[in-house]
């Protein structure tokens, strides 16, 4: 297993559940990069299908944007990988208990409804709250409800009066680093080993990978190899004759504390997000297309401009945030597709190799897809076949 982020740790854990031990190699450590800095919000899966119906941006309009924040372009749907969202979301409450027992770590899971705020002007233009809910109702099986301004102000007294209410839908959250750590420790108890080192190349025999070569000169033997290395997938996938296109982008957010705790409900408006966490902290972020910065040079430096924009934006939504104390300004590289839709995972077996696999390019959703991605990849590696319940998904997301 190359990569000790949420995806790699999940695959290692689920392989362990099948009696298959892993050696997880990472040039740094467990969840040091984006997985440990994520928002770690598990969104109710059908929300994305409903969201697609609200998107009218033509494909050609997306070209040249740093990153499009929608998940779709005409002719391509998140339905191809919706199973990853759905299975992960539906499993999380049980998974949290499982990881506490097997990994010895409280991942701080809790339900956190998410509300997309709507101004009076937007409500009038849409023709009322029922019109705003219609795309969600049309999908079927989507829990989306209108919460009016009075109810929101009971929860958030300082909410900007321009907001008349919001569309609320289910969501959950975990603490990102603790989540990956729990999976890693659970995997270790099932026989996994974690090794620090940078993989430079592979040793092969015919159509099989026999091991990996580390920068230190060490060679590690392997019965199978999985690449779960996010935006660094390019070079190693090319060595296997199947270069995977990837666009490294940078996203960042703020961890903050307030004198009083906020209710566990996410607020979103104008591409600004306020995410109260179970531990009393608040994640503050801006998430528009302009806020994903192309970092093909793999520069992971933080932006003071983005920090100030986030602080100003969230304070307009919830003025009490002017009293926030910044605990950490953090960010890291994400793996996006090189062309629209920019968020499209790659999962499966490399076509020219019997025992080489990949799970990458999850964009900013790696943590929230990792439970299902790990389980499905483990089944594929163990049985050599795509799981029937996700066969079409594997066909659409396969490398090559």
Name each model-derived stretch.
Residues 260-355:
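Active-site lid/adjacent beta-loop-alpha segment flanking the redox-cofactor pocket in flavoenzymes
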Residues 40-151:
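Dinucleotide-binding Rossmann-like beta1-alpha1 core, especially the glycine-rich loop
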Residues 1-24:
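N-terminal Rossmann-like FAD-binding beta1-loop-alpha1 element of flavoenzymes
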Residues 31-32, 216-264, 303:
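Central helical "cap/lid" subdomain
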Residues 318-400:
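C-terminal catalytic lobe of FAD-dependent flavoproteins
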Residues 16-38:
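Glycine-rich FAD pyrophosphate-binding loop
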Residues 166-216, 220-224:
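Helical element adjacent to the flavin cofactor pocket in flavoenzyme catalytic cores
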Residues 80-86, 119-128, 167-185, 299-308:
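Short beta-strand to alpha-helix junction loop
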């Amino acid at each position: 297993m190359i990569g000790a982020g949420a995806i790699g740790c999940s695959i290692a854990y689920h392989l362990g559940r099948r009696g298959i031990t892993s050696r997880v190699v990472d040039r740094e450590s467990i969840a040091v990069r984006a997985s440990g800095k994520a928002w770690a919000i598990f969104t109710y899966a059908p929300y994305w299908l409903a969201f697609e119906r609200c998107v009218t941006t033509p494909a050609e309009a997306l070209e040249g944007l740093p990153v499009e924040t929608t998940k779709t372009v005409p002719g391509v749907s998140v339905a191809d990988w919706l199973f990853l969202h759905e299975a992960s979301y539906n499993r999380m409450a049980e998974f949290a208990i499982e990881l506490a027992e097997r990994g010895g770590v409280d991942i701080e899971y809790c339900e956190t409804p998410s509300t997309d705020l709507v101004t009076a002007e937007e409500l009038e233009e849409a023709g009322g709250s029922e019109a705003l809910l219609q795309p969600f109702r049309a999908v079927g099986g989507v829990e989306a409800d209108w919460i009016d301004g009075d109810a929101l102000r009971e929860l958030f007294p300082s909410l900007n009066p321009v907001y008349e209410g919001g569309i609320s839908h289910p969501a959950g959250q975990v603490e990102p680093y603790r989540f990956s750590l729990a999976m890693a420790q659970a995997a270790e108890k099932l026989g996994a080993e974690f090794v620090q080192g940078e993989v430079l190349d592979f040793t092969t025999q015919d159509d099989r990978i026999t091991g990996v070569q580390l920068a230190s000169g060490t060679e590690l033997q392997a019965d199978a190899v999985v690449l779960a290395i996010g935006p660094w997938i390019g070079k190693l996938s090319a060595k296997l004759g199947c270069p995977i296109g990837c666009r490294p982008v940078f996203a960042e957010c703020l961890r903050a504390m307030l004198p009083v705790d906020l209710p566990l409900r996410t607020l979103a408006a104008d591409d600004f997000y306020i995410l109260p966490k179970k531990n009393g902290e608040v994640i503050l972020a801006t998430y528009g297309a302009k806020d994903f910065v192309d970092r093909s040079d793999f520069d992971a430096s933080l932006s003071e401009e983005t920090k100030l924009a986030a602080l100003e934006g969230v304070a307009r939504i919830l003025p009490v945030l002017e009293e926030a104390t910044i605990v950490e300004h953090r960010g890291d590289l994400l793996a996006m597709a090189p062309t629209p839709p920019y968020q499209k995972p790659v999962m499966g077996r490399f076509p020219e190799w019997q025992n080489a696999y990949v799970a990458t390019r999850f964009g900013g959703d790696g943590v929230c897809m990792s439970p299902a991605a790990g389980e499905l990849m483990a089944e594929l590696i163990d049985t050599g076949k795509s799981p029937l319940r996700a066969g079409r998904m594997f066909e659409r997301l396969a490398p090559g």
